[in-house]
Amino acid sequence: DKRVISSVSRCLNPYEEEGFKQMMDVAASDDLEIIVSNTTEAGIVYDPACKLEDVPASSFPGKLTQVLYHRYKAGKKGILMLACELIDNNGKELLKCVNQYIDQWGLDDGFRKYVNEDCTFCGSLVDRIVPGRIRDPKEVAELEQKHGYADPLLDVGEVFGVWVIEGDTK
C-alpha cells in the first residue's frame, strides 16, 4: 500500500553551511512543535569534544542543544521531544545529555529552566521494521511512473508497527 506522509516538508543537511543555517531557521520557527529522534541506540551519547560554536556539534544531543538554545534565544515556546532510540529511558537519557552540554558550555540558568520545564522529553518504545530506502533503481523508476512523481524520501516498512510514548501530563 502507498501512504503519502505530507507532514515532511524537506530534508536539511546540517553538515553543509546552508543546511545548518536552515536548521537554525526552523529552530526559531513558530511552526516547530515536535522533534522526533531516531539516531540508533548509539546516538544518545554525551561527547565532551562538542562545542556550542561547532557547525554542527558532532553528537546528536549536541546538535539538539544548539537547536534548543537558538530557539530559546529567539523567545519561542518549548518543544515536545520524542526519542525513539532503542535504549532504556531514551527521553531521560537525551535530556541528561542536553543538561551536560548546558553545564559544559556555561549556558544560562534561564535556558536550563526552559529545557527542563518548557520542553517535554518523552521516552518511547518503537516496534516496526523499516529496512530503508529501495535500492533497486528499476523498482524506484516503476514506482515513480506509477505514482506520477519522484520521491527522494521513498522508504518501505513492515505493515505491523507500535509506538508507545511515555510522558507527563503536559
Language model features: what each stretch is:
Residues D1-K170:
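Substrate/ligand-engaging "lid" and interaction regions
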